[in-house]
């Protein structure tokens, strides 16, 4: 499922290509590439629920509030997100890339993934995918993209 999400993001979204709204054709195309039907369905369902999640969280939390808070993770969240991942989320909050709202969306969507543990590289992709899909997050998406993809270029001698 996660591989399907990454493929969709790299192929259709990040490359600037038009993504087909026709889920039947998209599903067929992904199957032809070699993805399993089960993984395709889960990935598309995950993206659909991202939309629902955004609406629910943004309607329940005042967007003007962007206080830094200490997030208390549940045992399940701690199991899925190791200390490096939780530290990275805090780091993104401190850089004002994540707000309270986007942090909660990211954690909720991570918990919905059908993987037992998320590593730091997977987390970076998940955050990119989510920020790209949230209206109004274009600036922080670009900031994160520059941080992740241009950081290594700047430190190479």
Curated annotation (Swiss-Prot):
Disulfide bonding pattern of the chain: none
HAMAP family referenced in this protein's UniProt entry, alphabetically: Smg
PANTHER family for the chain: PROTEIN SMG
Family: Belongs to the Smg family.
Highest taxon of source: Bacteria
The protein's name in its UniProt record: Protein Smg
Positions of transmembrane segments: none
InterPro entries: Smg
């Amino acid at each position: 499922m996660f591989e399907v999400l990454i493929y969709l993001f790299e192929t259709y979204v990040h490359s600037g290509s038009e993504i087909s709204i026709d889920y039947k054709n998209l599903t067929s195309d992904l199957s032809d590439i070699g993805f399993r039907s089960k993984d395709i369905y889960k990935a598309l369902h995950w993206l659909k629920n991202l939309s629902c999640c955004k609406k629910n969280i943004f309607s329940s939390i005042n967007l003007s509030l962007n206080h830094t808070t200490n997030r208390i993770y549940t045992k399940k969240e701690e199991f899925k997100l190791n200390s490096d991942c939780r530290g990275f989320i805090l780091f993104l909050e401190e850089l004002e890339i994540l707000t309270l709202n986007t942090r909660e969306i990211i954690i909720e969507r991570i918990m919905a993934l059908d993987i037992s543990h998320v590593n730091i590289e997977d987390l970076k992709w998940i955050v990119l995918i989510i920020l790209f899909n949230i209206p109004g997050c274009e600036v922080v998406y670009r900031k994160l993209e520059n941080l992740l993809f241009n950081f290594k270029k700047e430190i190479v001698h």
